[in-house]
A protein has these predicted regions:
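N-terminal accessory/capping or targeting/presequence segment of soluble
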Residues: 24-129, 133, 137, 141, ...
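Low-complexity, intrinsically disordered or signal/transmembrane-proximal segments
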Residues: 18-20
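Acidic, Ala/Val/Gly-enriched low-complexity intrinsically disordered segments
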Residues: 3-7
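Intrinsic disorder
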Residues: 12-15
């Protein structure tokens, strides 16, 4: 019985490793597709929050672009993709989950609120140069957030550009459909 259980556990472990390996390859393909889009648009970095146009934390599948690009399924987190780096910022509720889900993806985990963790703005300032462009999907940022981001980065000669459509809708890879409108 013990040997049987060990074989089941080993088989399950091999299956999980296979899934994670292939999921990481898919994540890498998605990041490569996003980077190709950014290059075409003249954008050097893209910020992908976990929100929808209502700035909700829990969103319909269509608005889970951060989950789609990173594979991280926690409800809170922000991904930043540059031409050569990728990072995910999340809070302590999700540190362990993020470590597991990002493993092998090439996305670095930034643990928010820890003294050694750079903020997203610090990361952008450190990794971009003057005349760089940071892209956002303006539908999922508040006006206040977008203006603050724009003003802060402008001090370093970095501009912010809103891309009208969700970034994953522009890639050649499959993504969730927009939810139907309610007709109450």
């Amino acid at each position: 019985m013990k040997a049987e259980n060990e074989e089941i556990i080993n088989s399950f472990t091999r299956l999980l490793n296979y899934i994670y390996k292939n999921m990481a390859q898919t994540i890498n393909q998605r990041i490569d597709a996003l980077r190709a889009l950014l290059k075409r648009e003249g954008i050097d970095a893209f910020i992908i929050p976990s929100t929808d146009p209502h700035l909700s934390e829990y969103v319909a599948p269509y608005w889970k672009s951060r989950e789609w690009i990173s594979g991280f399924t926690g409800s809170a987190g922000t991904a930043v993709i540059t031409t050569d780096k990728a990072g995910l910022w999340t809070d302590s509720r999700y540190f362990l989950q993020a470590e597991q889900q990002l493993e092998g993806s090439g996305i670095d985990l930034y643990k928010e609120m820890l003294p050694e963790t750079p903020s997203i703005l610090d990361f952008l300032r450190e990794n971009l140069t003057a005349n760089s462009v940071v892209g956002i999907d303006g539908k999922v940022f508040s006006t206040t957030q977008a203006i603050a981001l724009q003003e802060d980065l402008a001090k370093n000669g970095i501009t912010v550009k809103s891309i009208a459509d969700p970034m994953y809708g522009q890639t050649a890879l499959p993504c969730p459909k927009h939810p139907p409108l309610s007709t109450r």
